[in-house]
């Protein structure tokens, strides 16, 4: 889920470079071409456009979200939930987790992004998981992370803070003071 405060892929006019928006459109076009026809030539064009956009102002993990939005069955969204989910060997094969671990620490350049995408797709195509494609994976990551967050929240609510516990002793302490 994208934070509305970071919903754009470019900086304000005074902050961005003259070709930032054109670079985004170029990436959009070559991403569609790659999704429709995965060839070495299209991968090369995609890589050049992606790497150019990668270093632009306001580009972080959101670039992977944008790719996912235009072709969700081709491009993986590497938002924080998906990264958390696919970095866990309970959710993805151990080989994948090891191969992707370092690449998920910072926004990957095109070569690493395509490798993560390809390895993840290969793991999903193997059919060992209930999620069979990137949209299913994203949905499952969202559901599981919500469950984990709710469990953490309920555990936190169950714990009584020491300050809360001490409030019960205030009347007793006051009575002892009054007795002298």
Predicted regions and their residues:
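An N-terminal alpha-helical hairpin/helix-loop-helix interaction module that forms a charged
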Residues: 1-56, 72-179
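Short hydrophobic alpha-helical segments that form membrane-spanning helices or hydrophobic packing faces
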Residues: 63-70
């Amino acid at each position: 889920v994208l934070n509305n405060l970071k919903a754009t892929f470019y900086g304000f006019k005074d902050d961005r470079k003259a070709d930032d928006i054109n670079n985004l459109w170029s990436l959009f076009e070559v991403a569609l071409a790659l999704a429709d026809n995965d060839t070495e030539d299209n991968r090369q064009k995609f890589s050049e456009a992606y790497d150019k956009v990668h270093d632009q102002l306001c580009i972080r993990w959101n670039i992977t979200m944008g790719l996912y939005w235009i072709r969700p069955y081709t491009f993986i969204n590497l938002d924080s939930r998906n990264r958390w989910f696919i970095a866990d060997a309970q959710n993805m094969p151990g080989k994948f987790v090891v191969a992707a671990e370092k690449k998920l620490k910072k926004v990957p350049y095109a070569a690493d992004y395509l490798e993560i995408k390809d390895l993840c797709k290969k793991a999903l195509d193997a059919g060992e998981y209930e999620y069979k494609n990137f949209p299913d994976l994203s949905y499952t990551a969202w559901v599981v992370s919500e469950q984990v967050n709710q469990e953490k929240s309920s555990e936190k609510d169950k714990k009584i803070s020491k300050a809360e516990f001490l409030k019960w002793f205030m009347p007793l302490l006051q009575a002892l003071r009054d007795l002298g």
